[in-house]
């Protein structure tokens, strides 16, 4: 029955709602906890009055809240009253401000207008101040330019004038050209007056520099000279003034050093040593070099070259050209300063050269003048009066040296010595070589400046030794002419001197060649050239000359060997036949020719073998050649040349085309055997 009867719809919904309600939700748990705080009896009456109980509880809570909010409400009411009062005050103030704004609007507009005018006036004032600074001189600057006393303020004012003058050029590019021209004219007047005054002051200061030997250049004077460089004409006047003053002062000091010496006589006068040319000239050059260093330092400090060089490193080409012009002025002043000492120096050096110094002294003087010529030109410049003077006296000393050599050489050539019996060099050769070695030592020890180099030594060697060699050649020629009428004799000693073999008879009957009388003269020349060459081998400076002498010796050795070989072949009767053996081109065999017939050739070869196989003295040994190496070399060359000549003859004899009947009996020694016999 219960399953068939359904529940009422409202109850069913409520029941479903209760069943669907989640008992673990936080709100439900909180509600139940709050209910348990005042619902403590679970009875039927209490459950029926649950709603009313809850509503009473809610009313109680609201009543408590209202009681608690009464004081707050009272405070809020008071605040509202005060806010209303404050709003009334603000309204009154706003009304007062509105009335004030209406009354002060004219004042505010006037103030704004005046403020804008003040800004414009301030800008104009700044522009005027900038214009006055860039285009006008202050009273203090004008006073500094016109005062008699020069100080740093003068140079600052002058620099400002130059700046204003440069700024005026900018005005000329605008529509203010008239103002620019007027300002430029005004600044030009100030500038020219200042430069003229500056020039007079610098000239006065420079006159003070000429009164002392070692003046000090103040920084103010350096600045003044640096400023004067902007006016080349005025600067040149001052530079000439400095040059003239120091010129006179240096001349007086040089004459005093020559004649009076230093203070109290120390150092002693330079002319005390006039008897010693080297020291005399060296002391004068040393004094000039020391004075040049001092004067150069003075002019260098005065013109402030280092500062100009430093400033030009970062500037354009035109300023570098200006720097070169400054260096030219620097050289001009130094040149002017030292012009005065040129003449007394030149006169004294010429007097030394006219006193006929010795050859060594004149050469040392030339080297000393050469060294100082380069040294002073490095400091002063090459195209200056002092350098030209030193160059002139150096040339004069060099001319004196070569004139002495020329006179000495002419004397040797005028009176050539006779040739000694042993063909040894004459004493003049040894003296000339000794003198040459001494001059070489002086050349090797001469001073050379950093920019200079040693002069060529070959002309000195030629002037020294060429006349000696020519003298030896003349002596040799005279010796040869003396013996030209005599026939040379050569003796040959055998074991039995009373008997002559057929070979000896042939040799003695053969006419001697005309070249034989040249042998002693050639040996004499070789000895002389070796006497010159040997001492020079240790010196590099004479290497080229030694090489040339070696070529001459080689040439004389060749001629000597050829003459001796021709003499030997002529004695054997082979001299005129060698050309036939070397260039036999005729169809007629050599055996059928009269001069190369077997009988004639047999006699000639017997004589040749007699020379080769004979006793000592048959072949020349050149005992009078004083250099063993050359003597041995000459003997070897003679032997080689004879062996080569015999080989030509042997090949012609053994050649079947020449038709010799018994070549082996005719030329019984092969060439190798002859070489062995000759020791080659």
Curated annotation (Swiss-Prot):
Bilayer topology annotation: Peripheral membrane protein
Entries under InterPro entries matching the protein: COG6, COG6_C, COG6_N
Spans annotated as Disordered: 479-517
Pfam families, per database record: COG6_C, COG6_N
GO cellular component labels: Golgi apparatus; Golgi membrane; Golgi transport complex
Compartment(s) of residence: Golgi apparatus membrane
Keyword terms, alphabetized: Golgi apparatus, Membrane, Protein transport, Transport
Biological processes per GO annotation: Golgi organization; intra-Golgi vesicle-mediated transport; pollen tube growth; protein transport
Oligomeric and partner information: Component of the conserved oligomeric Golgi complex which is composed of eight different subunits and is required for normal Golgi morphology and localization. Interacts with COG5, COG7 and COG8.
Role according to the record: Required for normal Golgi function.
Family assignment from sequence similarity: Belongs to the COG6 family.
This protein's name: Conserved oligomeric Golgi complex subunit 6
Taxonomic source organism: Arabidopsis thaliana
């Amino acid at each position: 029955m219960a399953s068939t009867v359904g529940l009422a719809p409202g109850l069913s919904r409520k029941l479903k709602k209760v069943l669907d309600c989640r008992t673990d939700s936080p709100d439900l748990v909180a509600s139940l906890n709050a209910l348990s705080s005042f619902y403590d009896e679970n009875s039927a009456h209490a459950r029926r009055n649950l709603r009313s109980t809850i509503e009473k509880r809610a009313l109680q809570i609201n009543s408590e809240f209202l009681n608690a909010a009464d004081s707050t409400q009272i405070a809020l009411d008071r605040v509202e009253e005060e806010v209303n009062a404050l709003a009334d005050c603000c309204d009154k103030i706003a009304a007062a401000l509105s009335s004030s704004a209406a009354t002060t609007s004219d004042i505010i507009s006037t103030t704004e207008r005046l403020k804008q005018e003040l800004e414009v006036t301030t800008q104009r004032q700044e522009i005027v101040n900038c214009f006055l600074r860039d285009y006008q001189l202050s009273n203090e600057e004008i006073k500094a330019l016109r005062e008699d006393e020069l100080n740093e303020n003068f140079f600052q004012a002058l620099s400002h004038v130059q700046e204003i003058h440069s700024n005026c050029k900018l005005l000329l590019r605008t529509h203010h050209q008239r103002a620019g021209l007027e300002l430029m004219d005004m600044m030009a007047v100030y500038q020219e007056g200042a430069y003229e005054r500056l020039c007079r002051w610098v000239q006065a200061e420079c006159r003070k520099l000429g009164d002392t030997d070692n003046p000090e250049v103040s920084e103010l004077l350096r600045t003044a000279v640096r400023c004067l460089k902007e006016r080349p004409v005025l600067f040149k006047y001052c530079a000439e003034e400095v040059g003239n003053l120091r010129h006179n002062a240096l001349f007086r000091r040089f004459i005093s050093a020559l004649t009076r010496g230093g203070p109290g006589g120390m150092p002693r006068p330079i002319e005390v040593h006039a008897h010693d040319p080297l020291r005399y000239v060296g002391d004068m050059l040393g004094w000039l070099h020391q004075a040049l260093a001092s004067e150069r330092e003075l002019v260098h400090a005065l013109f402030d070259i280092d500062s100009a060089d430093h400033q030009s490193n970062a500037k354009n080409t035109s300023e570098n050209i200006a720097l070169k012009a400054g260096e030219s002025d620097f050289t001009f002043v130094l040149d002017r300063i030292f012009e005065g000492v040129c003449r007394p120096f030149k006169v004294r050096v010429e007097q030394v050269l006219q006193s006929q110094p010795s050859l060594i002294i004149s050469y040392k003087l030339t080297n000393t003048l050469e060294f100082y010529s380069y040294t002073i030109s490095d400091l002063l410049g090459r195209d200056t009066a002092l350098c030209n003077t030193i160059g002139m006296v150096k040339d004069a000393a060099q001319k004196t040296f070569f004139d002495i050599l020329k006179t000495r050489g002419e004397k040797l050539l005028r009176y050539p010595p006779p040739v000694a019996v042993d063909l040894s060099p004459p004493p003049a050769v040894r003296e000339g070589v000794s003198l040459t070695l001494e001059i070489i030592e002086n050349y090797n020890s001469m001073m050379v400046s950093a920019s200079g180099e040693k002069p060529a030594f070959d002309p000195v060697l030629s002037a020294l030794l060429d006349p000696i060699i020519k003298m030896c050649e003349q002596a040799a020629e005279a010796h040869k002419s003396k013996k030209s009428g005599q026939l040379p004799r050569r003796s040959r000693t055998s074991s039995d001197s009373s008997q002559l073999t057929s070979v000896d008879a042939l040799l003695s009957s053969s006419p001697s060649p005309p070249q034989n009388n040249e042998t002693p003269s050639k040996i004499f020349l070789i000895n002389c050239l070796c006497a010159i060459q040997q001492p020079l081998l240790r010196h590099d400076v004479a290497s080229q000359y030694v090489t040339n002498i070696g070529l001459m010796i080689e040439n004389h050795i060749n001629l000597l060997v050829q003459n001796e070989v021709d003499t030997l072949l002529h004695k054997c009767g082979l001299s005129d036949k060698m050309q036939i053996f070397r260039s036999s081109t005729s169809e007629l065999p050599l055996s059928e020719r009269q001069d190369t017939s077997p009988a004639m050739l047999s006699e000639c070869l017997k004589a040749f073998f007699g020379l080769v196989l004979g006793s000592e003295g048959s072949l020349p040994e050149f005992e009078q050649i004083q250099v063993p190496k050359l003597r041995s070399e000459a003997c070897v060359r003679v032997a080689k040349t004879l062996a080569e000549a015999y080989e030509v003859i042997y090949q012609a004899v053994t050649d079947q085309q020449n038709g010799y009947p018994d070549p082996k009996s005719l030329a019984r020694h092969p060439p190798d055997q002859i070489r062995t016999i000759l020791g080659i």
